[in-house]
Amino acid sequence: MTITRWFFSTNHKDIGTLYLVFGAWAGMVGTALSLLIRAELSQPGALLGDDQIYNVIVTAHAFVMIFFMVMPILIGGFGNWLVPLMIGAPDMAFPRMNNMSFWLLPPSFLLLLASSGVEAGAGTGWTVYPPLAGNLAHAGASVDLTIFSLHLAGVSSILGAINFITTTINMKPPTISQYQTPLFVWAVLVTAVLLLLSLPVLAAGITMLLTDRNLNTTFFDPAGGGDPILYQHLFWFFGHPEVYILILPGFGIISHVVAYYAGKKEPFGYMGMVWAMMAIGLLGFIVWAHHMFTVGMDVDTRAYFTSATMIIAIPTGVKVFSWLATLHGGAIKWETPMLWALGFIFLFTVGGLTGIVLANSSLDIVLHDTYYVVAHFHYVLSMGAVFAIMAGFVHWFPLFTGYTLNSVWTKIHFGVMFIGVNLTFFPQHFLGLAGMPRRYSDYPDAYALWNTVSSIGSLISLVAVIMFLFILWEAFTAKREVLSVELTATNVEWLHGCPPPYHTFEEPAFVQIQSN
């Protein structure tokens, strides 16, 4: 029974659990890689070896965290668990395809790890730019394995996206409008549309790279009339929507958590929140070249991409101020998920402000490929996406398991993590402004102080990760069961108890529309 239940599952709750476990495991691999990076950079001089092995670690860290930690947890884990429950659907629209979406990920992960283990590894950075990723600078199978890994992860995400789009539009009760579904459902829907439109472009780009490497095509080789800049355009046309794919489900989670712990029955400005997410999704597709300000674009092109990028701050600001308005006048419960959510709002805003700085092409030409950029995107990912994951996990853990976490331990864990990530990434702004470049394993002594501080911060974050594992162990051994949940009238996912039965909404939900 156990083998068929977990290997052949078509149940959205089981598949969601598989995604969460897989994501947690990948997250530990990614954390280990990041600690290798910070160990190498903790003082001047070499630790691990040359820049090739260093860049292999950096590349693997990025791919593992993005494709095997954040996306599986936010979209696969929370999405599978919550979307059907929130819209009153018995399961996802295509339950067997759902199973395949998950089981494409472990082989994909295996291929990525294999790419590090053969030849010299793929030391290209997660962007995999040619000519560095070509068959001269990276002879051997490493980059090819990385490309195949991305193909599998991409197919997984595309199938998942089709599934979520069909489910959210087609499987809600007929009397319910799309504008009556919870914000997390909207967030996943917008995310799925972004995935569906952006991933095929990445697939095209890396497939052309594959043929350039192995079949003597010259898509990205000027010697045969190709252009390496074409690859950058294809990659970033995927890569920029991708960063919004990583954060949008987090926005949805934060909306739910903030409303719940502020004692509100709904978040402030529901329609504004929905349209802001759709605006972010649309704008995310027309700003990609802000990653390429240094490739020699025309000044008018740079002016457009600078302006368009800054426009994204408007819908993002709508969301931030709506969260603050949701808090306003609420009877705030200072429980751990609320702490994560408040941390998210503050730190995501800081990351957004450095993003506005980098949107200016004139400034970006100076700051491009420095640690200022690293600090910027780790503030929105390591303290945006990850804080949202933690807020959602601590909030919905009783729903997923029926057990409660120890609230004292989770609060301490939040405090340790908060100090750790800020100590790790805040000093990197200083390093970037002082001109320290990314993707080098060594640096002049002048940069030693802030690098050492940053590496100490990473060790504090490691302590937080270990604490989290202990907290999970404690919850499953203590087995404190959930007594009751408040606010179920406006939080449909809790309706069936903790944990919900294996099959929910087996007969269609009865929905009475309020006429006012």
Curated annotation (Swiss-Prot):
Name of the protein this chain belongs to: Cytochrome c oxidase subunit 1
Binding site for Mg(2+): 368-369
Record's bilayer topology term: Multi-pass membrane protein
Role according to the record: Component of the cytochrome c oxidase, the last enzyme in the mitochondrial electron transport chain which drives oxidative phosphorylation. The respiratory chain contains 3 multisubunit complexes succinate dehydrogenase (complex II, CII), ubiquinol-cytochrome c oxidoreductase (cytochrome b-c1 complex, complex III, CIII) and cytochrome c oxidase (complex IV, CIV), that cooperate to transfer electrons derived from NADH and succinate to molecular oxygen, creating an electrochemical gradient over the inner membrane that drives transmembrane transport and the ATP synthase.
Positions that bind heme a3: 376
Cofactor: heme; Cu cation
Keyword annotations of the record: Calcium, Copper, Electron transport, Heme, Iron, Magnesium, Membrane, Metal-binding, Mitochondrion, Mitochondrion inner membrane, Respiratory chain, Sodium, Translocase, Transmembrane, Transmembrane helix, Transport
TM ranges: 12-40, 51-86, 95-117, 141-170, 183-212, 228-261, 270-286, 299-327, 336-357, 371-400, 407-433, 447-478
Catalyzed reaction equations: 4 Fe(II)-[cytochrome c] + O2 + 8 H(+)(in) = 4 Fe(III)-[cytochrome c] + 2 H2O + 4 H(+)(out)
UniProt pathway: Energy metabolism; oxidative phosphorylation
